[in-house]
Amino acid sequence: MEFSTQSTASLHQIKTAALAVGVYADGELSPAADVIDRASNNAVRQVVKAEFRGRPGATLVLRALPGVSAQRVVLVGLGKQSEYNARAHAAAEQGFAAACVAARITEAVSTLAANSIADTPIRARARSAAIAAGAATYHYDATFGKPDRDARPKLKKIVQVVERGEAAQTQQGLREGSAIAHGMELTRTLGNLPGNVCTPTYLGDTARKLAREFKSLKVEVLDRKQVEALGMGSFLSVARGSDEPLRFIVLRHAGKPAKKSKAGPVVLVGKGITFDAGGISLKPAATMDEMKYDMCGAASVLGTFRALAELELPLDVVGLIAACENLPSGKANKPGDIVTSMSGQTIEILNTDAEGRLVLCDALTYAERFKPSAVVDIATLTGACVVALGHVNTGLFTQDDALADALLAAGRQSLDTAWRMPMDDAYQDQLKSNFADVANIGGPPAGSVTAACFLSRFAKAYRWAHLDIAGTAWRSGKDKGATGRPVPLLMQFLLDQA
């Protein structure tokens, strides 16, 4: 998708296949809609009064308006004017792009980012517009025998109309949003691929492909022997249950900070269970197909690296991905087994379906060698987090208030929100074992919290936060598919650090 800017002069003379103008739920027209209304002898107001309610993201296409050069004027709902905010703007931009896709339009012009929003500057509005357009034009057909090429979106270019003095900031926001959209696209596609295609080896190959495409990226993909040499006994114990070879992926983005700093890199750690059957503690058959999404933490790390490399972000970032399958077999972990992690801590495995923390703990120990300024792990870790927060907010766990504030702010800014969960030391008692240093589960109460508490035992050498994306990484039902979250949150966090 190509994005560019144009000045607001002579809107009615812009020649385009589709021109988007905003309409509020109370019938009030945005400034751009008012211009088009006057040029068309009040045609817009007449239609709005008769049949358009202005719900956020709703669209109504008007063809061949008199006095207007655009082939189509698309009325886009903005919601109530008194409640218009960044989320309503994103819904409007996505609704417009979706309408263009449905009409098989190749290029379009939007005036929506020009509508001012309190505490949301034009750069942020432009960034959101590009992300929304990317979401509307995403199309998956990688595993269809005969892909319907006519179903692929034709929309290739959107021009944002803004005030002349805002063009530079708008263009920067569009550039950032486009990169984030590309990262989300990669994340979604990796998540949507089936487990027999998107294997640990496939994830490693994807990382290598990114490193070939972007000169700022370096990659190392470790195999079983190398992981054994590191002493990653916990990770190995999970991988042992499958014939599919494990991979431990180390990605580095060597940014060039404007100012020299002694601070270490930001490290992102992704859970890469490419299929999770639960192991010996077998999951129910219903919806087990969705356990291909158990690598969405890893996918989000790869998507984030794709975005930050495209932007050439002046920041040093390391990505770590522990990738394997969790299957039942004669070599798989058994309830009651005890394994030794890379940190030296022993773990009693009471439930083999709590495997994500078993691979992450060794990755968190590996992260120590980078002397990081902060570590954020991303994982579809617990169903308990879905029970607690549903599918709206990602669960955020940390005892570092400053890091929590930075991640929460990034979530609000990017509309990829998180909610901070408790991590009181008292929860650690649930992880006590009579036979090892720690048990891998703490019983039903506060399951997402005790999972985070388990990880915290392996992250004491640095500032650390855990994002549980079990409720936000994918959707079920008729719209089943990966969402690309939390790439926007992670990228906003990194943009704020740069």
Swiss-Prot record:
Residues reported to bind Mn(2+) 2: 271, 276, 294, 355
Q: What is its EC number?
A: 3.4.11.1, 3.4.11.10
**What UniProt keywords apply to this chain's record, in alphabetical order?**
Aminopeptidase, Cytoplasm, Hydrolase, Manganese, Metal-binding, Protease
| Entry protein name | Probable cytosol aminopeptidase
> Where is the organism placed in the taxonomic lineage, from the top?
Bacteria, Pseudomonadati, Pseudomonadota, Betaproteobacteria, Burkholderiales
Q: Which GO terms describe its cellular component?
A: cytoplasm
Q: Where in the cell is it found?
A: Cytoplasm
* One of the GO BP terms on file: proteolysis
